[in-house]
Amino acid sequence: MARVTVDDCLKRIPNRFQMTLAAAHRARQLANGATPLVDPEKHKPTVVALKEMGAGKVGLEVLNRGQA
């Protein structure tokens, strides 16, 4: 597996504070039962959320989709 780094995510969302908010929100959604958009491979929700962001499958729009 390719290691997900903050730099990979910052290419998609240049503001690190917005990126952190989006990743935390998406991780909360995943922990509450949302379907992962990438292969979770037994990773924790936070890692899966970062993998989704690095792959370009999730962005700032996750903050506007309602409650986690």
UniProtKB/Swiss-Prot annotation:
GO terms for molecular function: DNA binding; DNA-directed RNA polymerase activity. One of its GO terms (biological process) is DNA-templated transcription. GO terms for cellular component: DNA-directed RNA polymerase complex. It comes from the Bacteria. It catalyses: RNA(n) + a ribonucleoside 5'-triphosphate = RNA(n+1) + diphosphate. The keyword Transferase applies. The keyword Secreted does not apply. It holds the Pfam family RNA_pol_Rpb6. Its EC number is 2.7.7.6. Gene3D superfamilies: 3.90.940.10. InterPro entries: DNA-dir_RNA_pol_omega, Pol_omega/Rpo6/RPB6, RPB6/omega-like_sf. Keywords: DNA-directed RNA polymerase, Nucleotidyltransferase, Transcription, Transferase. NCBIfam families: rpoZ. Belongs to the RNA polymerase subunit omega family. Promotes RNA polymerase assembly. Latches the N- and C-terminal regions of the beta' subunit thereby facilitating its interaction with the beta and alpha subunits. PANTHER family: DNA-DIRECTED RNA POLYMERASE SUBUNIT OMEGA. The RNAP catalytic core consists of 2 alpha, 1 beta, 1 beta' and 1 omega subunit. When a sigma factor is associated with the core the holoenzyme is formed, which can initiate transcription. This is DNA-directed RNA polymerase subunit omega. The gene is rpoZ.
